[in-house]
């Protein structure tokens, strides 16, 4: 999306804040319905970030697959659960929550320090990609495949990790 710098920066900060608030809602809300809606909000913010970075196909796939199908499936499964156990006796902080938050915070800071200490200028991107895309012999679906396996490989993998975490969380909530 071709926006002026300040508007682009504002939208980036706004969507990033939405991601943080939604992620905290997924983790901290005691009611699984509210947590599932918060997950839907996070997935919509991710698709809007893809629109902001001019990858409209990935944004549409994000909305259709994750928000439209997976999140609706999670909400549908949570609706069948007995919700009386969530409305009574809610402890805000337990020992297991403290240990988990300590481990997650340690992993977060180690990832941040690794990202900041890595020289990203030495990463060599493929030069053959531009030559392949300039040819008219490649169809649109092949171009999408090339972009997903080169330019958008990291966001594509991050989406799959988010889906895996969401499904594991939904299964663990359903088993309780």
UniProtKB/Swiss-Prot annotation:
The keyword Ribonucleoprotein does not apply. InterPro entries: NAD(P)H-Q_Oxidoreduct_6 (IPR050290), NADH_UbQ/plastoQ_OxRdtase_su6 (IPR001457), Nuo/plastoQ_OxRdtase_6_NuoJ (IPR042106). Its EC number is 7.1.1.-. The keyword Transmembrane helix applies. One of its GO terms (molecular function) is quinone binding. GO terms for cellular component: chloroplast thylakoid membrane. Gene3D superfamilies: NADH-ubiquinone/plastoquinone oxidoreductase chain 6, subunit NuoJ. It is found in: Plastid, Chloroplast thylakoid membrane. It is a multi-pass membrane protein. Keywords: Chloroplast, Membrane, NAD, NADP, Plastid, Plastoquinone, Quinone, Thylakoid, Translocase, Transmembrane, Transmembrane helix, Transport. The chain crosses the membrane at residues 10-30, 32-52, 61-81, 92-112, 152-172. It catalyses: a plastoquinone + NADH + (n+1) H(+)(in) = a plastoquinol + NAD(+) + n H(+)(out); a plastoquinone + NADPH + (n+1) H(+)(in) = a plastoquinol + NADP(+) + n H(+)(out). It is an enzyme of class 7 (translocase). It comes from the Eukaryota. Belongs to the complex I subunit 6 family. NDH shuttles electrons from NAD(P)H:plastoquinone, via FMN and iron-sulfur (Fe-S) centers, to quinones in the photosynthetic chain and possibly in a chloroplast respiratory chain. The immediate electron acceptor for the enzyme in this species is believed to be plastoquinone. Couples the redox reaction to proton translocation, and thus conserves the redox energy in a proton gradient. NDH is composed of at least 16 different subunits, 5 of which are encoded in the nucleus. This is NAD(P)H-quinone oxidoreductase subunit 6, chloroplastic.
């Amino acid at each position: 999306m071709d926006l002026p710098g300040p508007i682009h920066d504002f939208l980036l900060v706004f969507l990033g804040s939405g991601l943080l608030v939604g992620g905290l809602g997924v983790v901290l809300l005691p009611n699984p319905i509210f947590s599932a809606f918060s997950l839907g909000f996070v997935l919509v913010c991710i698709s809007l970030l893809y629109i902001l970075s001019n990858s409209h196909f990935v944004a549409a796939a994000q909305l259709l697959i994750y928000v439209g199908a997976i999140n609706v499936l999670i909400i549908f499964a949570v609706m069948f659960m007995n919700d009386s156990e969530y409305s009574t006796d809610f402890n805000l902080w337990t020992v297991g929550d403290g240990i988990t938050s300590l481990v997650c915070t340690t992993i977060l800071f180690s990832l941040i320090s690794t990202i900041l200490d890595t020289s990203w200028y030495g990463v060599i991107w493929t030069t053959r990609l531009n030559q392949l895309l300039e040819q008219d012999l490649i169809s649109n679906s092949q171009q999408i495949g090339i972009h997903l396996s080169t330019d958008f490989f990291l966001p594509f993998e991050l989406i799959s990790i988010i889906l895996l975490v969401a499904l594991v969380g939904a299964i663990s909530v359903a088993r309780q």
